From Swiss-Prot:
Annotated compartments: Cytoplasm
Chief place of localization: cytoplasm
Key words, A-Z: Chaperone, Cytoplasm
Assembly, per entry: Heterohexamer of two alpha and four beta subunits.
Similarity remark: Belongs to the prefoldin subunit beta family.
Gene Ontology molecular-function annotations: protein folding chaperone; unfolded protein binding
The keyword Chaperone belongs to this UniProt entry's keyword annotation: yes
Recorded superkingdom: Archaea
Name of the protein this chain belongs to: Prefoldin subunit beta
Transmembrane segments: none
GO cellular component: cytoplasm; prefoldin complex
Organism: Methanosphaerula palustris (strain ATCC BAA-1556 / DSM 19958 / E1-9c)
Statement: the UniProt record of this protein carries the keyword ATP-binding: no
InterPro entries: PFD_beta-like (IPR002777), PfdB (IPR012713), Prefoldin (IPR009053)
Length: 121
């Protein structure tokens, strides 16, 4: 069996790099989706709390009492921001998937072409 050409080795390395980037994007997306669910759950719980109840919110490393409406608004704003990030990551994921499939096809074609004897047509 012949050695793999430097061009194919480079394509394989690029394929692995794209795969790692896709995994990173999917991991971030999963993390953001989990944060969105947590925010929505907290918002639902706050809606069930009586208006006069004390509500606290983390501000940096300190917990401060805030009006219920402000805490709910803050949760909604954060969830919306996270949803935008998720959409952005989904676009990146689609682009990476297309790039991955293209590189994969190129590598497969190069490997099959390199192992095939020339056809006399």
């Amino acid at each position: 069996m012949s050695a793999i050409s430097p061009k194919i080795q480079n394509q394989i390395a690029m394929l692995q790099q794209v795969q790692q980037q896709m995994q990173t994007i999917m991991s971030q997306k999963t993390q953001y989706e989990m944060e969105i669910r947590e925010n929505r759950r907290a918002e639902e719980e706050l809606n069930d709390v009586p208006q006069e109840s004390a509500v606290f919110m983390n501000v940096g490393t300190v917990m401060m009492q805030k009006p219920k409406e402000k805490v709910i608004a803050s949760l909604q704003e954060k969830a919306e921001s996270l949803e935008l990030r998720v959409k952005s990551l989904e676009k990146q994921e689609k682009m990476m998937q297309a790039k991955f499939e293209q590189l994969q096809a190129q590598v497969k074609e190069a490997l099959e072409g390199g192992n095939r004897p020339p056809n006399a047509a």
